[in-house]
């Protein structure tokens, strides 16, 4: 009976998480749609603006997040096997990589501010065209919103690692909690995998 109740609780928890993730996909989906519309309406201006972005830094951050996804997957697998040390190691590795992503993004923003690429810190007349201004506005909004999600994810990963280490989340019974946070982190990574080509590789 207890196993049935636990299975139902897990299914309910995962369903709630899937609904939340769907809402996040719709949020970023709207930004992707705007980017596509801009690309179709103003191809030359958008391509010119995209070429000024630091695609090398973006590529490095893509590798960082993909590696963090692997770490989370290993943490979930360890949690399901009841291995607390492996779970903590995977969660902390992913959190550390998340911090690395944010640090690289901060450096990139600093470069872009100095190069007068970010509309929030640059007069409107410094841009080649209104379309370029709008595209770089979209870039800042999308990447900053994503960075907020990464920050939340890092907090969740670190907090969960602390709970597991302190035995506040017994394993494997508490593996669902690790799985839920893992799903969130994977979504954050997938969103970036789409953001990178949409924003940096427009040609």
Spans of features found by a protein language model:
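...captures the hydrophobic TM-helix bundle architecture rather than a specific catalytic motif
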Residues: 1-203
């Amino acid at each position: 009976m207890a196993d049935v109740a636990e299975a139902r609780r897990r299914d309910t928890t995962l369903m709630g998480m899937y609904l939340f993730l769907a809402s996040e996909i719709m949020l970023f989906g709207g930004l992707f749609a705007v980017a596509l519309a801009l690309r179709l309406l103003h191809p030359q201006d958008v391509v010119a603006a995209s070429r000024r972005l630091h695609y090398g830094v973006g590529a490095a951050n893509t590798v960082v997040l993909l590696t963090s996804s692997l770490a989370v997957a290993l943490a979930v697998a360890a949690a399901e096997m009841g291995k607390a040390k492996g779970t903590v190691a995977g969660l902390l590795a992913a959190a550390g990589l998340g911090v690395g992503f944010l640090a690289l993004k901060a450096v990139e923003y600093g470069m872009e501010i100095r190069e007068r690429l970010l509309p929030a810190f640059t007069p409107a007349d410094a841009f080649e065209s209104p379309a370029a201004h709008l595209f770089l506005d979209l870039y800042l909004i999308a990447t900053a919103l994503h960075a907020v999600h990464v920050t939340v994810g890092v907090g969740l990963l670190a907090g969960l690692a602390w709970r597991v280490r302190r035995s506040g989340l017994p394993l494997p019974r508490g593996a669902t909690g690790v799985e839920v946070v893992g799903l969130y982190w994977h979504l954050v990574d997938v969103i970036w995998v789409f953001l990178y080509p949409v924003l940096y590789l427009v040609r």
